[in-house]
Amino acid sequence: MLFRSHLNRAFNASYTGGDGSALIVNNHAAALSVTAGDASASNLLTTSAALSQTSLEQMLIQIRQAADPRGKKIRLTPKKLVVAPGNMLQAEVLLKSVLRAGTNNNDLNPVKSMGLLGDVAVLSRLTSATAWFVQTDADNGMQVKWRRKIEKSMEGDFETDSVRYKSTMRLGSGWTDWRSMFGTAGT
């Protein structure tokens, strides 16, 4: 995933997007909050929490309540749970268990039964062991642009019958719509 550096700085106010805020904050100025009626919206989990059944469910509800810049509810779909290696086993339990994780009850696991999240992305280069994120299908969210298209070259050596190949390219990444990533720093 090309966006690991953006996720490592997701809560850092020194790295801002088009609305002047970090990628994940509780006060994006570019949208109206449907629930609070004020001039800000959030893609930060209300209360920082470790990855658990309850916190994941809260995040998924928050994603479904997202609004566009005019304050109208939009239908965002959660696509991928993004975690550091320390959370990969917990993430697998939460996404694949048929019943609610860690309980003796016979309750269904709604994340699994409703098919709310497809898969887990485990990023070994995340600097926080506790932060976790949910990527959505927001249009124009996390973006990759070509800085230099792929260039290929080949060179042969007549004396040794060796051939050398070379391929280079340059990409730039960033985000346009903060609704493409929701997250929490964890605990």
Task: Name each region found by the language model.
Residues 1-2:
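Short, small-residue-biased leader/transition segments that mark boundaries at the very start
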Residues 6-9, 101:
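Generic macromolecular interface patches on structured domains
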Residues 8-26:
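Short, glycine/acidic-rich hinge or "gate" loops at secondary-structure transitions
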